[in-house]
Amino acid sequence: MTIALGRIPKEEKDLFDTVDDWLRRDRFVFVGWSGLLLFPCAYFALGGWFTGTTFVTSWYTHGLASSYLEGCNFLTAAVSTPANSLAHSLLLLWGPEAQGDFTRWCQLGGLWTFVALHGAFALIGFMLRQFELARSIQLRPYNAISFSGPIAVFVSVFLIYPLGQSGWFFAPSFGVAAIFRFILFFQGFHNWTLNPFHMMGVAGVLGAALLCAIHGATVENTLFEDGDGANTFRAFNPTQAEETYSMVTANRFWSQIFGVAFSNKRWLHFFMLFVPVTGLWMSAIGVVGLALNLRAYDFVSQEIRAAEDPEFETFYTKNILLNEGIRAWMAAQDQPHENLIFPEEVLPRGNAL
């Protein structure tokens, strides 16, 4: 019997399949569909920040020097927020404010909106990158879910908070000293340290640092020995196939130290994921509250008693007075466009704050 085989027709790839193959090809640095968002946005955000901190002044928006060109250093340079009069304008280069003039756009604070928006999309692109890569190699998506914590903080602080206030002016500028100034502003105008969401955020971040230190030390302490080297890195083979440390020994140690210990690796590592991510999300929720000018804890009874009795004072009432000093001093310096003038008797005296 003769069987005649015709040619098997090749399936023609359309443009989408061709692009998909190229984007998801196995290479040293994975690109993926998420890379179409991540790489351009990260490039523009970082490029805008380096350009702003090197060349662009904040004289027209804040009355400050903020670039290396003006004599700032790495800690004091910043890409500062637009002027308060520009409210929530996107400050597009071709918009009615700059009208295509790049120099004017920089003077008005256009680089800040450029860096903030591209930075936000770059972070989202990085999270999508983790989703995409995890899906392609059949991992669970907890890395991407965890990264939602930093994204929530960035979006709430740099975008949602100023949207709730009068303009981008009240967002943090992109610089080290500028962020410190913003923290002082948050304390003076919102009493942020006494906000329960801030407390949960601090507990989450510092608790995560403690968990990392404990976990790393415990694993190092309970490694199975498979060599006679004099130190950790020579005595243990990094390619060993079997389990690398003793969970049973670790459990026994911490049971004796605390009376309780994790007996299950999955629960232990989920807890290490849960603590910092929840802390960051709580902080983000708190900042959204501040955008709406929600107040922190107020212990009014202590304030009234302190006002009536000169001998009564608590750490809380002292902090309230400090906040008043921050507001009185900062408002006039920070918002020169408001022409705020405070009577001498209400201002803090000299350096003896």
UniProtKB/Swiss-Prot annotation:
The D1/D2 heterodimer binds P680, chlorophylls that are the primary electron donor of PSII, and subsequent electron acceptors. It shares a non-heme iron and each subunit binds pheophytin, quinone, additional chlorophylls, carotenoids and lipids. There is also a Cl(-1) ion associated with D1 and D2, which is required for oxygen evolution. The PSII complex binds additional chlorophylls, carotenoids and specific lipids. GO terms for biological process: photosynthetic electron transport in photosystem II. The modification N-acetylthreonine is found at residue 2. Fe cation binds at residues 215, 269. The modification Phosphothreonine is found at residue 2. One of its GO terms (cellular component) is photosystem II. Photosystem II (PSII) is a light-driven water:plastoquinone oxidoreductase that uses light energy to abstract electrons from H(2)O, generating O(2) and a proton gradient subsequently used for ATP formation. It consists of a core antenna complex that captures photons, and an electron transfer chain that converts photonic excitation into a charge separation. The D1/D2 (PsbA/PsbD) reaction center heterodimer binds P680, the primary electron donor of PSII as well as several subsequent electron acceptors. D2 is needed for assembly of a stable PSII complex. This is Photosystem II D2 protein. It comes from Brachypodium distachyon (Purple false brome).
